[in-house]
């Protein structure tokens, strides 16, 4: 939740420009990836398959359109089915990973939608003509151990200034990495650590010469959670939050230990809140109290983290039918009092982590309901689109968290507004916030694609360019005139349903802004009809911020 991320990053491999939506001779709506000259979103009546397996529809369509996709071989040999589900509208949604001789192609995924036996949409970019890539013919000369050593040494020299204590070792896999119109054999190395500063770095190391092709910090990759639940009776305690407001919270009483614990057994697999005790070891100790009265000042951050995690769970369940962040009722774990004066909050892949702030720039981060909603939405994104935390896909990742963090705030009706982090940012300055969805320029963020940040700081502007999508979401909900474009608002509820459907069922790891527009248009058509006002409003909202 930094106002500006301080870490730079090399540009992501995928071309982020896409041509405006067009129509093929067959009546299909197509968005093109400008760099690779391949479709990144196709919708329409693509192919009817009768009684055959649904994945065969996708293989047949891609093979039929081989002149467009140019995979250089049979689709079934190049696309591996990695997931299949039925959504709320009865569509079958399948996700495929592109592979080359069995090696995954970094960042590629194809999401396919089948309705009543007919293929109606494909989203995601594929890399063409890999057989003709000369760099892929070079022999692998770098070992896994050497790649990991290169990444850790670079972290030491450029990030931590001392050798970090890594967690669970490094995770490394061999990939095909597309970059600058070419593709290379590379290692994807994940280096995770909590000290001396938290980091979750992704490195792309050329497997033929050891060069660092890309690197970025992404604090949301998988790592195991810790801490054990207690057996006992569900109870209701009372506490005071960071802002001094009283809250009733679900707790557990253990007669064996004689304590009350911040363990909520009423939601999914439980909500657990831990005391980090100003250290940097996770998860810490399950929060305890002797009388079920969590009213001490030290309790405040834990009270809010626990209570607001329950609100976020309820929002996703009651509004979107989603059971916890993974859709399967995963336990929600939060640690407060992480480090000393730590000015951040993050999702680490298995749990939430909240710093106390320094008291001047930030209050304890769990005191902002939109902050809690924001960070837990990163977990939802982690389990759905998996948006790469860099450049436009990273800005979409951040915008989704802002959008749903704000919608959670409205759901709870706790002084809701369109500002982000206003409750915990600069407590001595009235009316200040981290970002604004209604007026991104208020805090120096762009509100139109023509004003986007194009540098490498902040992972390519993930916290900056999110303002463009935030403004589109605000306009879609509330309506208005922006840069001379009139938008008819459809309300928060419909806006949220459209963005949720786009996130969960259409976006893929390297989706850019144009693909997000296409995904939202298709989501609105799915929900409200292709000729509906909602579809028109989505188009108006993205037109208003210059995204086509």
Curated annotation (Swiss-Prot):
GO biological process: proteolysis
Chain residues that bind Ca(2+) 1: 289, 291, 293
Pfam families, sorted: FTP (PF07504), PepSY (PF03413), Peptidase_M4 (PF01447), Peptidase_M4_C (PF02868)
Active site feature: 375, 463 (proton donor)
Gene3D superfamilies, sorted: 3.10.170.10, 3.10.450.40, 3.10.450.490, Neutral Protease Domain 2
Cofactor: Ca(2+); Zn(2+)
Protein family membership: Belongs to the peptidase M4 family.
Designated name of the protein: Thermostable neutral protease NprT
Species in which this protein is naturally found: Geobacillus stearothermophilus
């Amino acid at each position: 939740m930094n106002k500006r991320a301080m870490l730079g990053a090399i540009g992501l491999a995928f071309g982020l420009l896409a041509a405006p939506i067009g129509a093929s001779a067959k009546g299909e709506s197509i968005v093109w990836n400008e760099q690779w000259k391949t479709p990144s979103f196709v919708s329409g009546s693509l192919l009817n398959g009768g009684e055959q397996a649904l994945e065969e529809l996708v293989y047949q369509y891609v093979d039929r359109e081989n002149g467009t996709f140019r995979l250089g071989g049979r689709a079934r040999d190049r696309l591996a089915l990695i997931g299949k589900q039925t959504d709320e509208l009865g569509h079958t949604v399948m996700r495929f990973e592109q592979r080359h001789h069995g090696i995954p192609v970094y960042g590629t995924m194809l999401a396919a939608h089948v309705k009543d036996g007919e293929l109606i949409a494909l989203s995601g970019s594929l890399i063409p003509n890999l057989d003709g890539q000369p760099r892929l013919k070079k022999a692998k000369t770098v070992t896994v151990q050497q790649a990991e050593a290169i990444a850790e040494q670079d972290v030491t020299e450029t990030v931590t200034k001392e050798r970090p204590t890594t967690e669970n070792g490094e995770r490394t896999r061999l990939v095909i990495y597309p970059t600058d119109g070419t593709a290379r054999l590379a290692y994807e190395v994940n280096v995770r650590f909590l000290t001396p500063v938290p980091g979750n770095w992704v490195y792309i190391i050329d497997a033929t010469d050891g060069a660092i092709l890309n690197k970025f910090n992404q604090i949301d990759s998988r790592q195991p959670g810790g801490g054990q639940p207690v057996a006992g009776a569900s109870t209701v305690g009372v506490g005071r939050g960071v802002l001094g407001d009283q809250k009733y919270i679900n707790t557990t009483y253990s007669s064996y230990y004689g304590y009350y614990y911040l363990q909520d057994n009423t939601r999914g697999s439980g909500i657990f809140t831990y005391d980090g005790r100003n250290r940097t070891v996770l998860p810490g100790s399950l929060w305890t109290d002797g009388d079920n009265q969590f009213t001490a000042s030290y309790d405040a951050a834990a009270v809010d983290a626990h209570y607001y995690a329950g609100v976020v769970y309820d929002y996703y369940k009651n509004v979107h039918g989603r059971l916890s962040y993974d859709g399967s009722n995963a336990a929600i774990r939060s640690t407060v009092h992480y480090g000393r004066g730590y000015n951040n909050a993050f999702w680490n892949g298995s749990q939430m982590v909240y710093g106390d702030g320094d008291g001047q720039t930030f209050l304890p981060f769990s005191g902002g309901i939109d902050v809690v909603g924001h960070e837990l939405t990163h977990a939802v994104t982690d389990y759905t689109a998996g948006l790469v935390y860099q450049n436009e896909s990273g800005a979409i990742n951040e915008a989704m968290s802002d959008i749903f963090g704000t919608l959670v705030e409205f759901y709870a009706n706790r002084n809701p507004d369109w500002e982000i982090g206003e409750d915990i940012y600069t407590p001595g300055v009235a009316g200040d916030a981290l970002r604004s969805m209604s007026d991104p320029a208020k805090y120096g963020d762009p509100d139109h694609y023509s004003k986007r940040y194009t540098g490498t700081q902040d992972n390519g502007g993930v916290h900056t360019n999110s303002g463009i999508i935030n403004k589109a979401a605000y306009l879609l909900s509330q309506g208005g005139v922006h840069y001379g474009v009139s938008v008819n608002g459809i309300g928060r509820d419909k806006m949220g349903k459209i963005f949720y459907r786009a996130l969960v069922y259409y976006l893929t790891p390297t989706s850019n802004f144009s693909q997000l527009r296409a995904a939202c248009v298709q989501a609105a058509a799915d929900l409200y009809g292709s000729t509906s006002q909602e579809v028109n409003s989505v188009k108006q909202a993205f037109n208003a911020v210059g995204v086509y």
